[in-house]
Amino acid sequence: MYPVALKKYFLSIMLALVSSGVSAEIFLFSSGNQFHGCLDCEESDQNSICNRYGKFGSLYQSSSIWNANGIGNVGRRDSPFSDMGIGLKMADTQGNFKGNLSISDKGDTEYSQLLKVIWGANQENYSDVRNDFCTLIEKLNNKKI
């Protein structure tokens, strides 16, 4: 694992790289159009993937991307953490497709690139990945106008 100082430096670089392409309220859906939370909602939002006490941010809820035995399982085709899968569909509030959230080559968004790097940097530890990813999301939310 990276030393803490290097990790913080790395995360600040990643934040700078993606802060220009951030949009508001991106929702995640599996291939069957099952809802899996809001990617960039405020942490306190009950639908936020960063609300660790909510249905979509908990390590223990099967609908949470952070659950290794649920939608986050690396063996699932629609898991964001599958090397070979398509990940979850991303859509805005109008239902417009915004790409896939995936660490695989199908992950064609800045969010996917962030997730892929954080996934590797945290040695695939779901709790640490959630914490780092959500820290960046919070910082990105604070930059919105």
Language model region names:
Residues L11-S12, N142:
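Short amphipathic alpha-helical "recognition" segments used for binding
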Residues M14-S23:
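Hydrophobic h-region of N-terminal signal peptides that target proteins for export
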